[in-house]
């Protein structure tokens, strides 16, 4: 593991900058793994096979579906902030849309009424609109491989 302490940096860099700052800056930009530090000790790292790191793998979701979920969550957050804006202590409840998707419509309504029970404003319009939006929203499917 690289150390950023001045005692461990003994050789000056050719461009005259402090090598400790370079090491610290480089380690702050990306995470290093054991394969990265091992490949740095070899002069030609291009010939060493690198294993795929799990953080580099990507998963494809349906972008339209993700966009609908994002818009729905933003709408819910905005509505909840509006409902609780008159409250002295800001304690906005969290509404888990995925958990609501698992429930029946009546259970969803009961759950939302319980969550929004201490709201200073009327919540019936918000609850009915959220329930109608949930019917249109599909659960996020498993990622495509």
Curated annotation (Swiss-Prot):
Keyword Phosphoprotein: yes
Tissue expression notes: Detected in colon, intestine, kidney and brain cortex.
Functional summary from the UniProt entry: Inhibitor of PPP1CA. Has inhibitory activity only when phosphorylated, creating a molecular switch for regulating the phosphorylation status of PPP1CA substrates and smooth muscle contraction.
Post-translational modification: Phosphorylated on several residues.
Keywords, comma-separated and alphabetical: Cytoplasm, Phosphoprotein, Protein phosphatase inhibitor
Gene3D superfamilies (alphabetical): CPI-17
Official protein name in the record: Protein phosphatase 1 regulatory subunit 14D
Main location group: cytoplasm
Entry GO MF terms: protein serine/threonine phosphatase inhibitor activity
Annotated localization: Cytoplasm
Phosphothreonine: modified positions: 58
GO CC annotation: cytoplasm
Region (Interaction with protein phosphatase 1) residue spans: 21-25
SUPFAM superfamilies for this protein: Myosin phosphatase inhibitor 17kDa protein, CPI-17
Keyword Amino-acid biosynthesis listed: no
Effect of residue 58 to E: Reduces inhibitory activity by 16%. Reduces phosphorylation
Coiled coil: none
Name of the gene encoding the protein in the UniProt record: PPP1R14D
Compositionally biased intervals (Low complexity): 1-14
Family: Belongs to the PP1 inhibitor family.
Residue ranges, annotated region (Disordered): 1-59
Residue ranges, compositional bias (Basic and acidic residues): 37-47
Basic residues: compositionally biased ranges: 21-32
